[in-house]
Amino acid sequence: MWKLVGWSLALLVLVGCEATATSVPDVEQPTSVDPITDSKTISILAWNVESDGNDPSVIAEQLNAFNGYDIFCLQEVRAENFDRYTAALGRQFQSINGRTGRSDRLQISFDSERFELLETKELMEHRDFILNNGTHRSPLYVRLQDRVTGIQFIVMTNHLARGNAELRKQQAIGLREWGRDQNVGVINIGDFNMDYDFATERGNSAFLEIFRDNIFSWAKPVEFIDTNWADRDGDGKDNYPDSMLDFAFVPGPAKDRNPVCRVIVRDGDFSDDDSTSDHRPIELKLQ
């Protein structure tokens, strides 16, 4: 549920993160408090920037052009580009950088003039559920507090396993159970590699697991638009058209914030080349 000193936006990364000039408490779960409604919009942009297939200077320019967002959740970030991408967002942004994932790390950046950082974690596991087998990305989250309203929330970002279907399924189960155990609202956003097909309206086994027991709901985009370009055979055509890898998930009570998601399409974003990302960003706004 939404809480005055707590509603959560979920971005996943929990094993120790780097925060800029901020002391971070190691708290497993947010504190439960009385509910309150905040009328001010919170806007989030999530984007897999394709760590090994982009020109970092081009990505930084594109990030700089995204104005008006409070929180950025990036996937596939090389460690040497953390500072570059943070600087591109503006002086008021503070970043939490994931330590897992080798060259494909996670990064969450937020407007530090609006929000105070209370907690951050990368999750290797939750209860008995594995979220990282040691060679992948751990879910990353931050717990923030609005400096004006006092409202607290969690933002979690993810990049689930691509080539290991069984691990991806276990990650989805672990995230679902993590969401079940939270006592504040949660938004989980990022690249989930769940292979949702527009024609069949189905995803893979991880897609099925994350929705089991109705813990998470999908903030479906207002228009279904392909979020990933994959030309594995080099013929200039997308091998998986009309599909999605990138999602925004919210718990049932988060619907009270009227979440609106859309896929951001820019001129020339697809087909992908060596300077740009092979993913389109997604945007989530909560009223």
Per-range role (PLM):
Residues 6-15:
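Bacterial N-terminal signal peptides
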Residues 17-90, 99-106, 122, 173, ...:
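N-terminal, active-site-proximal structural segment of metallo-dependent hydrolase catalytic domains
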Residues 24-29, 121, 180-187, 194-287:
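Metal-dependent phosphoester-hydrolase catalytic domains
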Residues 41-51, 119-123, 141-143, 152-162:
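Active-site-proximal beta-strand elements of phosphoester/diester hydrolases
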Residues 43-46, 70-75, 97, 106-110, ...:
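Structural recognition of the beta-strand scaffold that forms the well-ordered cores
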Residues 49-53, 77-81, 100-104, 113-116, ...:
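Solvent-exposed loop/turn segments at secondary-structure junctions
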Residues 59-62, 138-215, 219:
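Extracytoplasmic, non-cytosolic globular domains
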Residues 77-152:
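Structured beta-strand-rich core segments of catalytic domains in phosphoester-bond hydrolases
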